[in-house]
């Protein structure tokens, strides 16, 4: 499956700067034409746009310190068309500056951000000349740490470990990789689930569930391509491991969940014609486009999951 499409691709290295136009007045019309084309033809895969202060500009040296006044409005026009964000120069403090940080902060928890490091530490880049003064020749691990810190500040959902020396140096800094696995992106956890342990067939039941996002990013369930497809769900599983009934909480919204801020919901469900017997209660984050099967991995112990991804949380006897 495709995680995302880099849905612009023009400019030097495809990073939306150092453009060449026959007529400079075509900058915005060209940008609008391309973003319209992608948004109309790719409706299920997330689309990403590089965010920076010289978007689509004919910058002679690639970058300029002064932000172009068109950049913010152009980026926000793409976001309105369903785009999310990426940046290719994390760790390059001469490029990823206050303008970029402020734009990321403005759109945190509204659209996801994807990180790619800028310094190619194993090739021609002299990363030790970075304006921050934090990097030393022969120590690419310093670059990796700065990329991680900048990513956490931007609440990124994904980190691109790239290829070659970048991949090797990330593995030599496994503490950073493990830190992102634990805390990066979104990490959705059901911290409390309350349910009846006995019921009569046909009874109306009250279910309460509390969720927390343990990651610094957010679940982008709100982006146009996902369109709120993922929802918390309960299931009753019989003794043979078969799901006999599911209940989806359409009012619960994973894109609202933030690190350190648990959110609780209460829903009433109809037990219906579930036969008498003992069942296992289970929860998941269901994919409502695929018959409510578990759709997103949860931040839970894998040993507590069924083969198809339901988290077992308790028992109920139906009389």
List each model region and its residues.
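Extracellular/luminal regions of secreted and cell-surface proteins that mediate adhesion/ECM remodeling
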Residues: 178-319
């Amino acid at each position: 499956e495709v995680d995302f499409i880099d849905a612009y691709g023009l400019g030097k290295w495809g990073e939306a700067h150092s453009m060449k136009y026959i007529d400079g007045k075509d900058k915005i019309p060209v940008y609008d034409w391309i973003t319209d084309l992608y948004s109309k033809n790719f409706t299920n895969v997330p689309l990403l746009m590089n965010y920076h202060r010289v978007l689509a500009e004919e910058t002679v040296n690639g970058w300029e310190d002064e932000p172009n006044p068109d950049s913010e409005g152009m980026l926000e026009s793409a976001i309105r068309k369903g785009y999310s964000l990426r940046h290719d120069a994390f760790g390059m403090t001469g490029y990823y500056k206050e303008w970029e940080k402020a734009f990321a902060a403005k759109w945190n928890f509204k659209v996801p951000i994807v990180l790619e490091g800028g310094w190619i530490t194993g090739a021609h880049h002299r990363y030790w000349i970075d304006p921050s003064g934090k990097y030393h020749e022969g120590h690419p691990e310093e670059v990796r740490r700065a990329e991680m810190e900048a990513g956490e500040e931007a609440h990124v959902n994904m980190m691109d470990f790239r290829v070659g020396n970048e991949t090797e140096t990330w593995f030599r800094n496994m503490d950073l990789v493990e830190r992102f696995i634990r805390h990066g992106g979104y990490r959705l956890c059901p911290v409390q689930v309350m349910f009846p342990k006995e019921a009569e067939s046909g009874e109306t039941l009250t279910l309460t569930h509390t969720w927390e996002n343990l990651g610094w990013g957010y679940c982008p369930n709100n982006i146009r391509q996902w369109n709120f497809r993922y929802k918390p769900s309960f299931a009753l599983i019989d003794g043979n491991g078969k799901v006999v009934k599911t209940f989806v909480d359409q009012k619960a919204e994973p894109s609202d969940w933030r690190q350190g801020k648990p959110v609780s919901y209460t829903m009433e469900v109809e037990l219906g014609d579930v036969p008498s017997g003992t069942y296992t209660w289970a929860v998941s984050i269901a994919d409502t486009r695929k018959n409510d099967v578990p759709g997103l991995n949860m931040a839970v112990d894998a040993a507590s999951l069924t083969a198809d991804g339901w988290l077992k949380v308790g028992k109920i006897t139906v009389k």
